[in-house]
From Swiss-Prot:
Protein EC: 2.9.1.3
Quaternary structure (record): Monomer.
Function: Involved in the post-transcriptional modification of the uridine at the wobble position (U34) of tRNA(Lys), tRNA(Glu) and tRNA(Gln). Catalyzes the conversion of 2-thiouridine (S2U-RNA) to 2-selenouridine (Se2U-RNA). Acts in a two-step process involving geranylation of 2-thiouridine (S2U) to S-geranyl-2-thiouridine (geS2U) and subsequent selenation of the latter derivative to 2-selenouridine (Se2U) in the tRNA chain.
KW Transferase (keyword) present: yes
Gene Ontology molecular function, alphabetical: transferase activity, transferring alkyl or aryl (other than methyl) groups; tRNA 2-selenouridine synthase activity
Gene source species: Escherichia coli O139:H28 (strain E24377A / ETEC)
Keyword entries, A-Z: Selenium, Transferase
InterPro entries: Rhodanese-like_dom, Rhodanese-like_dom_sf, SelU
Protein name per the record: tRNA 2-selenouridine synthase
UniProt keyword Transferase, yes or no: yes
Biological processes per GO annotation: tRNA wobble uridine modification
Length: 364
């Protein structure tokens, strides 16, 4: 069985989205995992704690014996069934544990005894994690063009349409604002960084690119923060600003935050609960900026939001949301973005409407 253990092997695994059967405990997987990994643990969280305690108190031999005792009989059969099914479903995959140690070797040996030869990652998750960190540091050194613009200018779509674009908000599963949450929970910080590195590696491998196209983001995207090496490079990057008419921005925001989010919530939860989730999502977003709006203005906009939701529920029309969205943009989001942009005005190299910026970026 050929093991993969060179830096190039690790990068090739990430670029190819090689399926990884990660046999670490669920708590370890939740703290950080590779994008193409599935968690089929050798030991669950409680079993891992018990074996770890035994190791500290009685040594490695006793801990190994306890592990075999805990994962035996029907439990072992159930886990073997899951590993075997995963191996057959993913014949090009690999096994992975924390450091390429006993857990992945034990599972590998059990599979071998069952007639399945399956490689493992030498160095385990730790080695892959070091690869993603180093890859991000290296790839972030390439030139960057940032796409800026006020809320609703279609910055994310523009980035998505570039062959050398990386959608940071899509990877973070958050759109970066108070209303930015999606129906997908955000990943742990380590998993987000691993996903970002894998996406950068794949994009670079496809394009052999000269520069990155990214959205002009702050350090935080929801609960995830950008790797410092990338964030530092972004502060030095040229900025192309999308300046679309206000009416076009409103159309985009209506589609993205009202029509699409309502559809997504009802699709996920059903009509009744989905409507409640959608209402809570909008109220939570507005409440998140209550302090900055001031209590009186917040209460006024919250009342308009309630009225808009009542109309939407009764008629299906989202037009009523303009009564609170327009002042929110003009009084809060637009002034805030313009203030931020003024502080980096010397970085702005191009301004234009969406199609003009897209054409300018394409020519870089």
């Amino acid at each position: 069985m050929q093991e993969r253990h060179t830096e190039q092997d690790y990068r090739a695994l990430l670029i190819a989205d090689t399926p990884i059967i990660d046999v670490r405990a669920p708590i370890e997987f939740e703290q950080g995992a590779m994008p193409a990994a599935i968690n089929l643990p050798l030991m669950n969280n409680d079993e891992r704690v018990a074996v770890g305690t035994c190791y500290k108190q009685q040594g490695s031999d006793a801990a190994l014996a306890l592990g075999h005792k805990l994962v035996a009989g029907e439990i072992r059969q159930q886990r073997m069934y899951a590993w075997r099914a995963a191996c057959l479903q993913n014949p090009q995959g690999i096994l992975c544990c924390a450091r390429g140690g006993q857990r992945s070797h034990i599972v590998q040996s059990w599979l071998h005894a069952a007639g399945i030869d399956y490689p493992l990652v030498e160095g385990g998750y730790k080695a892959l994690r070091q690869t993603t960190i180093q890859a991000t540091i290296e790839l972030a050194q390439k030139p960057i063009v940032l796409i800026g613009g006020c809320t609703g200018c279609g910055k994310t779509l523009l980035v998505q349409q570039q062959p050398n674009g990386v959608d940071l908000e899509g990877l973070a599963r958050h759109r970066g604002s108070a209303f930015g949450r999606t129906l997908q929970p955000q990943l742990s910080q380590a998993s987000f960084e691993n996903l970002l590195a894998a996406e950068m590696l794949k994009t670079d491998a496809r394009q052999n690119l000269r520069l990155w196209v990214l959205e002009d983001e702050s350090r935080m995207i929801g609960s995830n923060h950008l790797p410092e090496c990338l964030r530092e490079r972004m502060t030095q990057a040229a900025i192309a600003v999308v300046e679309d008419p206000f009416e076009i921005r409103l159309e985009r925001l209506n589609e993205e935050y009202f029509l699409r989010m309502h559809h997504d919530f009802t699709h996920a939860y059903g009509d009744e609960q989905g409507w409640q989730e959608y209402c809570e999502y909008l109220h939570h977003g507005l409440s998140a900026i209550k302090r900055r709006l001031g209590l009186q203005r917040y209460n006024e906009l919250a009342a308009r939001l309630d009225a808009a939701l009542t109309t939407q529920l009764a008629t299906g029309s989202t037009d009523g949301h303009l009564a609170w969205l327009v002042p929110l943009l003009k009084e809060y989001y637009d002034p805030m973005y313009r203030y931020q942009l003024e502080k980096k005005a010397e970085k702005v190299v191009f301004r234009g409407e969406w199609a003009e910026v897209a054409e300018w970026v394409k020519a870089r």
